[in-house]
């Protein structure tokens, strides 16, 4: 018995087998539509932001400090 799945793009039935060239998609067109959605960021993988604006407050900086001409973290070695 073969497994049948729905095409993620158009919901058409797709038989999951070795000769299904575009699985899980039904066609190259649907595959490219999906790729375009990822490339244009319509599809994204949700992640928790590692940047916490409140952390700046704890360090004694505000966001404007990061746009100054002088880098407060610069040392003589990095010039």
From Swiss-Prot:
- What is the name of the gene encoding this protein? yacG
Q: Report the domain of life of the source organism.
A: Bacteria
State its cofactor.
Answer: Zn(2+)
Q: Is Metal-binding one of the keywords?
A: yes
Q: Does the keyword Hydrolase apply?
A: no
One GO biological process term: regulation of DNA-templated transcription
The protein's assembly and partners: Interacts with GyrB.
Q: What is the species listed in this Swiss-Prot or TrEMBL entry?
A: Shewanella halifaxensis (strain HAW-EB4)
Protein's job: Inhibits all the catalytic activities of DNA gyrase by preventing its interaction with DNA. Acts by binding directly to the C-terminal domain of GyrB, which probably disrupts DNA binding by the gyrase.
**By what name is this protein known?**
DNA gyrase inhibitor YacG
Q: Which residues does the record give as Zn(2+) binding sites?
A: 7, 10, 26, 30
How is the cofactor bound, as the UniProt entry phrases it? Binds 1 zinc ion.
For this chain, the family text in UniProt reads: Belongs to the DNA gyrase inhibitor YacG family.
MF terms (GO), sorted A to Z? DNA topoisomerase type II (double strand cut, ATP-hydrolyzing) inhibitor activity; zinc ion binding
- Which keywords does this chain's UniProt record carry? Metal-binding, Zinc
